[in-house]
A protein has these predicted regions:
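Sec-dependent N-terminal signal peptides
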Residues: 4-13
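Cell wall/extracellular polymer interaction/catalysis modules
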Residues: 19-171, 178-195
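C-terminal, well-folded lobe of enzymatic/effector domains
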Residues: 198-199
Length: 200
């Protein structure tokens, strides 16, 4: 009987450990709700109804978290890395690489949640020398233009996942790899309507 209970306890411990390992693995994110909200928003505000950009800064910065979603095909056209802001100007931020902090405050170097309209294409001193101005559409990101928040590329950003390493930090701008920007640029130039970018 003792042996029986010993092996039973051993099996229970192994099962617990396996359960912990499975639970610790990050499950794929389901953005079905966000896609539906985004499409309705684009229709209501006369924005591009073919695709939009979704950035989930809740994910590890070494993993793909910039998604170009095709409304009609109902799938991601691209999944790539993107930076978040250092957010360390007005207070210390020891976890700045591990976790994105949000603020709409000017000069905060933080990322800001919410929906943006991708605006004018302009010259950039970074990456492939192209940037797009971002217009904040919500209270959480209304200072985007005052903060000079733009979508641009940067040589320091990898074009493929680098997890468990982290992507570099920006001053609040969503910066992508040069190769990714070369894909985004023609998409944006060819769009006859403004494109939605949504940061979670």
């Amino acid at each position: 009987n003792r042996n029986f209970f010993f092996y039973l306890g051993l099996l229970f411990c192994i099962a617990c450990q396996q359960g912990k390992q499975v639970g610790a693995q990050e499950l794929p994110k389901d953005y079905t709700t966000q896609h539906s909200i985004a499409l309705a928003y684009c229709k209501a505000h006369k924005m591009n109804e073919d695709f939009y950009f979704l950035i989930d800064l809740r994910l590890h910065s070494g993993k793909n978290r910039f998604f170009v979603y095709d409304f009609k095909q109902k799938k991601n056209l691209y999944e790539k890395l993107v930076t978040h802001g250092s957010c360390d100007v007005f207070s210390s931020n020891p976890d700045k690489f591990e976790k994105a902090q949000y603020s709409n405050q000017v000069n905060s170097h933080c990322s800001a949640k919410g929906k943006y309209k991708i605006g004018k294409r302009d010259y950039s001193s970074w990456g492939i020398k192209v940037k797009y101005w971002l217009e904040g559409l919500e209270e959480s990101n209304s200072n985007a233009q005052k903060r000079l928040i733009v979508l641009h590329s940067w040589e320091a950003v990898s074009d493929s996942e680098i997890y468990p390493d982290y992507s570099p930090l920006s001053w609040g701008c969503p910066a992508v790899s040069n190769a990714f920007m070369e894909l985004l640029d023609p998409l944006l130039q060819q769009s006859k309507k403004p494109v939605l970018l949504w940061i979670l």
